[in-house]
Amino acid sequence: MASVRIREAKEGDCGDILRLIRELAEFEKLSDQVKISEEALRADGFGDNPFYHCLVAEILPAPGKLLGPCVVGYGIYYFIYSTWKGRTIYLEDIYVMPEYRGQGIGSKIIKKVAEVALDKGCSQFRLAVLDWNQRAMDLYKALGAQDLTEAEGWHFFCFQGEATRKLAGK
């Protein structure tokens, strides 16, 4: 098994991050939904007031190899606030390339996000998963996550594009 390192993303990683975002969307059967550009990822994640934070998983080259590290996974997270529980971290995306799954890389990304949550004083760590992705649900439960759909019956809603403009009267 190759050596893997989880680290904070750098601005120069945006091309790899976008590639992985597209792979995740394809896996989720939602590839037509990806509208983000590499430039937007740079502007939104690496300015003075970033909208998101990102971790990347990279495979380190074997000793003596000329190739550099290869980004094979990522996790994008940001901070939200719960009026009941306070500071919360939300993992928007987590993805590992298929050929690197089953090596604990996803778990390492999740554990690193948990470390960030504790360092920032967060009381909860939230994420969502499509209802057909049983492998991911099993992983999250094995790591100690609670399924809030089962436990509390929450449904999450989203106003997008035109619905937001209409709601805002614009």
From Swiss-Prot:
Per UniProt, subcellular location reads as: Cytoplasm
Q: Which GO terms describe its molecular function?
A: diamine N-acetyltransferase activity; identical protein binding; N-acetyltransferase activity
Enzyme class (EC, first level)? transferase
Record-listed E.C. numbers = 2.3.1.-, 2.3.1.57
**In which family does this protein belong, per the annotation?**
Belongs to the acetyltransferase family.
Function, in words:
Catalyzes the N-acetylation of the amino acid thialysine (S-(2-aminoethyl)-L-cysteine), a L-lysine analog with the 4-methylene group substituted with a sulfur. May also catalyze acetylation of polyamines, such as norspermidine, spermidine or spermine. However, ability to acetylate polyamines is weak, suggesting that it does not act as a diamine acetyltransferase in vivo.
Name of the protein in question: Thialysine N-epsilon-acetyltransferase
Source species of the chain: Homo sapiens
